[in-house]
From Swiss-Prot:
Cellular component aspect of the GO annotation: cytosol
General function of this protein: Catalyzes the oxidation of 5,10-methylenetetrahydrofolate to 5,10-methenyltetrahydrofolate and then the hydrolysis of 5,10-methenyltetrahydrofolate to 10-formyltetrahydrofolate.
Protein name: Bifunctional protein FolD
UniProt keyword DNA repair present: no
Organism name: Rhodospirillum rubrum (strain ATCC 11170 / ATH 1.1.1 / DSM 467 / LMG 4362 / NCIMB 8255 / S1)
One matching Pfam family: THF_DHG_CYH
Residues that hold NADP(+) according to the record: G170, R171, S172, S195
PANTHER family to which the protein is assigned, alphabetical: C-1-TETRAHYDROFOLATE SYNTHASE, CYTOPLASMIC (PTHR48099:SF5), C-1-TETRAHYDROFOLATE SYNTHASE, CYTOPLASMIC-RELATED (PTHR48099)
Length: 296
């Protein structure tokens, strides 16, 4: 019997429906409309697609959506001024600066300029600190969207995570480190590994939960896994195109075929973690709006 398929697309849809209902209630009973602003600098094709998707989904759940499109030649000072204007705008609850930025703009400086209470990506050092000391836990606070979505998927399969052993493969500030912090807050016993960790297969075999976010195509094999483990594959890698094909196959960091034969539950790529990321961006924006209303 194969692993249970964790359908991130369907779960994200359910989350968006709950968000839409809460947005409607906020409008009806408190006169609040969550506002999400995305700052896009330049003409990067992938960024244009991502921003378009975020805008479409924000509008679909009833949010106020603003996309600030700036030319690639926009100066760092002008981008900072735009961020400061959005910080001061009472109709905007969430601010997201789409990365990457043009080479002449310091990404860290721009991200630091965002009001931490409007930092729906959860990348500001204040929010990183809140997560590390347990003030944020995936249900409260501005937590990076991909780890937040992964935690929701895990809880959907396992319920209470207390006492589970968990391995996070990957140490990025965007996924790996915050994922480990969230699992700690959920009372897991957590190991954080990376591509240079020794005896990685042996580590994996001892774990109830494996989160792969290392950026290496199909690195985690089925024989690395403990039977019945829950596997969350954050990877998104495009293999070289086969002769005559326009595009290569999209795969994760886990060898899906072999892993699905051993795991108890697993996310596919695509259709697993990816859809949860934008849904959690909307969830963070909603939470920021509710915090604004509470402080009014």
């Amino acid at each position: 019997m194969g692993a249970h398929l964790i359908d991130g697309k369907a779960i994200a849809q359910q989350l968006r429906e709950r968000i839409a209902q809460e947005v409607a209630d906020l409008k009806a009973h408190r006169g609040l409309v969550p506002g999400l602003a995305v700052v896009l600098v330049g003409e990067d094709a992938a960024s244009q697609v991502y921003v378009g998707s975020k805008e479409k989904m924000a509008v679909a759940v009833g949010m106020h959506s603003v996309v600030c499109r700036l030319a690639a030649t926009t100066s760092e000072a002008e981008v900072l001024a735009k961020v400061e204007a959005l910080n001061a705008d009472p109709t905007i609850d969430g601010i997201l600066v789409q990365l990457p930025l043009p080479a002449h703009i310091d990404e860290d400086k721009i991200l630091l300029a965002i009001d931490p209470d409007k930092d729906v990506d959860g990348f500001h050092p204040v929010n990183v600190g809140r997560l590390s000391i347990g003030q944020s836990n995936g249900e409260h606070g501005m937590v990076p969207c991909t780890p937040k979505g992964c935690l929701m998927l895990l809880k959907g399969v396992l319920g209470d995570l207390t006492g589970k052993t968990a391995l996070v493969i990957g140490r990025s500030n965007i996924v790996g480190k915050p994922m480990a912090q969230l699992l700690l807050s959920a009372n897991c016993t957590v190991t954080l590994a990376h591509s240079r960790s020794r005896d990685l297969p042996d580590l994996c075999r001892r774990m109830d939960i494996v989160v792969a976010a290392v950026g290496r195509p199909e690195m985690v094999k089925g024989d690395w896994l403990k039977p019945g483990a829950v596997v969350i594959d954050v990877g998104m890698n495009r293999l070289p195109a086969a002769p005559g094909a326009e595009k290569g196959k999209l795969v994760g960091d886990v060898d899906y075929a072999s892993a699905a034969a051993v795991a108890g539950a697993i996310t596919p790529v695509p259709g697993g973690v990816g859809p949860m990321t934008i849904a959690c961006l909307l969830a963070n924006t909603l939470e920021a709006c509710k915090a604004r209303g509470a402080g009014a």
